């Protein structure tokens, strides 16, 4: 599909996280550096400051924020002949971009690791649940391409760094959803020259002071642990205003209550206007997916 395309649009889910931005920029790097395609990554809304470093090193204008540059994004979607959707199982997760994407006559490819992929909307689907991240799934797909032939050192440097960054964020630095293939991916990329230490510094040692103070406030005053071992934290608008909260700064907070022996599941709710964004993590033997499907329509 990429071989027969001249103008490619890459899209990811709304409120993009590290895996979305990592896999999206990795695909962008592969298409532009290896396939010499005219390509752009379109994110529905802004990339959080905490992971914006992932987009550094990519050409100006190649990463488009739909809510900020709507006309430019619409032109890209309407004129492209291939759409690649990464890290989301349906166009419904692309917010205001959904209608444009569905109406497009371009061929469509899905690359994702979530449950229930909307395969009917795509010409080609790569879907695997037993894998750490969309970034890892994309890595193994790229390893099978004739340009790479299983040699990670042939990947463009910025593509390889994005892949390792995306996987690292989605596994919480190898804490969740890690498989033997995940370690093999990391090993190959590091052997190929990716600077993992630099990635970790950018991800985990580059926050604002307010984030640390917010974390302490939430854990001391907003954390509730039920008798059945479910922990939940609500980050309401008042607290967000108090600490000048920036989107993305609560990344990883949902994992913290799991350090308590009695906690089997952790739920983190973030107020956004008239809705709450929900993140769920659980320990082995307890299904976060089942909880999301039953109570949170996800």
State what each model feature region is.
Residues 1-15, 22-57, 62, 68, ...:
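Hydrophobic helix-and-loop "lid/oligomerization" segment in the mid-to-C-terminal part
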Residues 17-19, 87, 112, 170:
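Acidic active-site catalytic centers that drive phospho-/nucleotidyl reactions
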Residues 18-24, 91-95:
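Short glycine/serine/threonine-rich phosphate/pyrophosphate-binding segments
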Residues 27-28, 100-103, 126-127, 185:
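Glycine-rich, phosphate-binding/catalytic loops in enzymes
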Residues 41, 108-110, 125-127, 230-232:
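Conserved beta-strand scaffold positions in the cores of enzyme catalytic domains, especially
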Residues 57-58, 104, 120-122, 295:
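Short, structured coil segments at secondary-structure junctions
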Residues 64-121:
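Active-site cofactor/cluster-binding pocket
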Residues 113-187:
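Short alpha-helices
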């Amino acid at each position: 599909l990429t071989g027969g395309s001249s103008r490619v649009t890459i899209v990811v889910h709304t409120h993009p996280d590290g895996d979305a931005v990592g896999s999206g920029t990795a695909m962008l790097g592969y298409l532009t550096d290896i396939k010499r395609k005219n390509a752009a990554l379109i994110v529905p809304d802004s990339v959080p400051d905490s992971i914006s470093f992932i987009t550094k090193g990519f050409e100006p204008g190649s990463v488009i924020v739909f809510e900020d540059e709507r006309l430019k994004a619409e032109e890209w979607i309407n004129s492209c002949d291939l759409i690649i959707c990464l890290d989301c199982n349906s166009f419904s997760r692309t917010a205001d971009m959904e209608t444009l994407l569905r109406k497009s006559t371009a061929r469509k490819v899905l690359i994702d690791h979530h449950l229930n992929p909307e395969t009917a909307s795509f010409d080609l689907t790569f879907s695997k649940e037993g894998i750490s991240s969309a970034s890892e799934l994309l890595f193994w797909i790229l390893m099978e391409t004739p340009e790479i032939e299983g040699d990670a050192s042939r990947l463009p440097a910025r593509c390889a760094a994005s892949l390792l960054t995306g996987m690292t964020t989605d596994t919480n630095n190898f804490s969740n959803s890690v498989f033997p293939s995940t370690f093999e991916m990391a090993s190959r990329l590091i052997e190929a020259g990716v600077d993992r230490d630099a990635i970790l510094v950018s991800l985990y040692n580059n926050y604002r002071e307010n984030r640390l103070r917010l974390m302490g406030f939430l854990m001391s005053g907003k954390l509730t642990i039920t008798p059945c071992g479910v922990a939940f934290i609500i980050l309401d608008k008042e607290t967000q205003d108090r600490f000048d909260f920036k989107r993305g700064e609560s990344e990883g907070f949902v994992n913290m209550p799991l350090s308590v022996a009695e906690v089997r599941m952790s739920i983190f709710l973030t107020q956004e206007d008239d809705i709450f964004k929900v993140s769920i993590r659980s320990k082995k033997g307890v299904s976060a997916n089942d909880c999301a499907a039953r109570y949170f329509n996800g």
